[in-house]
Amino acid sequence: RMSAASMFFSTEMSLLAKLLRGKPLQMANEIHSIIWSFTYAFGMAISGFVVNSYGIKAAFVIDAFIFFIALVIFIKIDFVVKASITSDKIFQLIKDGFIYIKSNKIILHLIFLHSCVGITSFDALITILAKNEYKYIISVPLAIGLSNASRAVALMFGPVFISKYVTKENLHYLMIFQGFSIILWGFVQNDFYISLIALFIVGLSTTTLWSFTYALLQNNCDEKYIGRVISYNDMFFMLSCVLTTLFIGLMASLTSVDIITILLGVCFFAFAFYYTRILKWI
């Protein structure tokens, strides 16, 4: 299931890059992220109800049925995109993709830059807080659900207020804002209801940051290699998410959750500085 979802996502983002360029591409990325955020929040709410009322098997059957509906819808869509024709073998295509990235350093820099969004995959932090801090105030499942829902709502509405002000020249300020918002959340985590507000602020800039850095990569990549570059980018992005989760798990046994959160926020300051160093090449 996860392999299929990953393959679909890479194909989808490659297709968007072939259909659109520049600002329209960034807006398409934002719309995609908004839809994802809505379904993420809505899915959590529905899945909890289904699992509690009908069991796990029913949830899996419904999940598979949703994929079937999506397949029926996509079959009927006619995308006006010229199919790539190649006689190279798959391993040669993979090798050529890595050679292309190696010979175009800016692509490598942008892949690394986009990975900063993976730092916001701090679901483990929310779970730890719910089990250790919030269980005295509210049930653990409800604490996790409300925390994720608060961030998901912000992910949906953030681009409406922020994206029109973000440009290539001031993107680093958005990264700094993301860092400060995460640090703010770290300071107010002990109060569940205030932390919901802080999580909302954290989510406001994440969607725009994700879509803008993704658009930078898509716009700077040759169409011939866009599919492979997007796939490698997703691999690196997932690595960033995994490393963030491992970091949280390791540090949770060494220090407090608020310190971990603050360290994650500081990482965005480092990425903001890094972006200012590579901006002249973009």
Where are these predicted regions, by residue range?
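Juxtamembrane intracellular "pre-TM" segments in multi-pass secondary transporters
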Residues: 79-111
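A single, central transmembrane helix in multi-pass transporters
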Residues: 54-61, 99-159
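Helix-loop junctions on the cytosolic side of multi-pass membrane transporters
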Residues: 14, 18, 56, 60-89, ...
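C-terminal transmembrane bundle of multi-pass solute transporters/carriers
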Residues: 132-282
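Cytoplasmic helix-loop-helix junction between adjacent transmembrane helices
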Residues: 1-38
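Hydrophobic alpha-helical segments of secondary membrane carriers
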Residues: 31-39, 113, 232-236
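Residue-level signal for discrete positions within transmembrane alpha-helices
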Residues: 37, 41-45, 118, 152, ...
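Hydrophobic transmembrane alpha-helices of Major Facilitator Superfamily
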Residues: 3-11, 119-124, 191-192, 204-212
